[in-house]
Each structure stands twice: as C-alpha cells, then as structure tokens.
C-alpha cells in the first residue's frame, strides 16, 4: 500500500467532498469550492538547489545568526530608554505629584482656610480645622491629607483661590509605613518650601491656560 503524504491526502479528501458519492448530491458546488484556499498543501521542491538550500539553513543555523545580527545592530543605535534614577525624563508643568502648601514671599501662609479643597476632594482625603486670628483673618490650625486616599485629580489645586495647595513636581516619595503617608500641615509646608522654585515656574508656565 502506497503511503500518502499529507498534502496528497488533503487533496484527495477535498476531491471526495466535491464529487460526492456515486449518484448522490455533491457536498459543495464547484463555484464555491473553487474559492477555497487550502493551507500547507504545497509540497516542498525536490530539486537539488532547493534541497541544498534547506540543508544549509538547517545545518549552518542561518536563521539563528540572522536574529543575532539584528540584536547586535541595536547596540550601535541611540537608546530609547534612560538610565533611571540617574537620568530623568522631562515633566509637564501640569504634572500632579506630591502635595505642598505654599507661602507668600514674606513667609506668610497662603492658605485662608476657605475649605474649598476639602469640599471638592472626591476621595475625602483632606481634613481642615481653622480659627480666626486677632486681626480677623482665618488660618488653619490643622491641614491633613491622607495620601493613601488621594487620587491625584488636581481638584484641590484648581479650587484654591490663592494657589496655596498645589501638586508639585516630586513623584519620588515612597515610604515604608502607612503612617508616613498621612501628611500634616508641617509636612505640607516643608514640601512647599523645598519645591517653591519649581512650583512657581510651573504655575507661571501654565498661567495662560488656567
């Protein structure tokens, strides 16, 4: 019995499905069958050149060396990544990072305890307590932000009428404990003092679009 190759067997099955049993109806019309595309039915060529080429690709690993050549070519191209944390990419002036409370150049706190940021915060992450001063102005006695609740939407910064609470450019403030992410007024003011130059520059750069 002659052993049939897979492509030959597939062609025989397709022919049988097309012609059908003697005296019976065909399974497929010739017009439809003519449009069929059979996958992997092409037999490999057996001439000397084709056989030699296949043997060379198999024995000499040409595909492997072609892949290695592609990999080595990228060693001489400009890298698409940066060496973080020693190199850092640019940040938008609208970047929303770690929170900070700002002061006026005189050193006076900007916050007027209007509590708009506390009211607008969708995560209810801000807690403010305030009392009036002798001159009638209001200032905060407590300004807490639970950074584990914050979703960095920027609503607090948008709602503030005096640019007191802002989200600065710092994004490297990971901690080892939960308690370190519960910011109080002192922590927020220290952040503002530390990043004031960058914060002021970002606000100025975005001034026309606010």
From Swiss-Prot:
Q: Name one GO molecular function term.
A: 4 iron, 4 sulfur cluster binding
Record flagged with keyword Nuclease: no
EC number(s): the record gives 7.1.1.2
Cofactor binding note from Swiss-Prot or TrEMBL? Binds 2 [4Fe-4S] cluster.
Q: Which UniProt keywords apply?
A: 4Fe-4S, Electron transport, Iron, Iron-sulfur, Membrane, Metal-binding, Mitochondrion, Mitochondrion inner membrane, NAD, Oxidoreductase, Repeat, Respiratory chain, Transit peptide, Translocase, Transport, Ubiquinone
Q: Where does the UniProt entry say this protein principally localizes?
A: mitochondrion
Outline where the chain's transit peptide begins and ends. 1-34
Query: What is the enzyme's main class?
Result: translocase
Per the record's keyword annotation, is NAD included, yes or no? yes
InterPro entries in the record, alphabetically? Answer: 4Fe4S_Fe-S-bd, 4Fe4S_Fe_S_CS, NADH_quinone_OxRdtase_chainI
Q: Which family does it belong to?
A: Belongs to the complex I 23 kDa subunit family.
Q: How does it assemble?
A: Core subunit of respiratory chain NADH dehydrogenase (Complex I) which is composed of 45 different subunits. This is a component of the iron-sulfur (IP) fragment of the enzyme. Interacts with RAB5IF.
Q: What is this protein called?
A: NADH dehydrogenase [ubiquinone] iron-sulfur protein 8, mitochondrial
The gene that this protein is the product of is: NDUFS8
């Amino acid at each position: 019995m002659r052993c049939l190759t897979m492509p030959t067997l597939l062609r025989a099955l397709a022919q049988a499905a097309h012609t059908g049993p003697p005296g019976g109806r065909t399974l497929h019309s010739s017009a439809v069958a003519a449009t069929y595309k059979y996958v992997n039915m092409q037999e490999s060529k057996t001439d000397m050149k084709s056989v030699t080429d296949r043997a060379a690709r198999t024995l000499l690993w040409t595909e492997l060396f072609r892949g290695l050549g592609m990999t080595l070519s990228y060693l001489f191209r400009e890298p698409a990544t940066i060496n973080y944390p020693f190199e850092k990419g640019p940040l938008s002036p609208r970047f929303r990072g770690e929170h900070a409370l700002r002061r006026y150049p005189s050193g006076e706190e900007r916050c007027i305890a209007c509590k708009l940021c506390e009211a607008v915060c969708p995560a209810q992450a801000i807690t403010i307590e305030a009392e009036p001063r002798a001159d009638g102005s209001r200032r905060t006695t407590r300004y807490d932000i639970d950074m584990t609740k914050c979703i960095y939407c920027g609503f607090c910064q948008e709602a503030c009428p005096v640019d007191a609470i802002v989200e600065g450019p710092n994004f490297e403030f990971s901690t080892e404990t939960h308690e370190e992410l519960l910011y109080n007024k002192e922590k927020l003011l220290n952040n503002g003092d530390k990043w004031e130059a960058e914060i002021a520059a970002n606000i100025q750069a975005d001034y026309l679009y606010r």
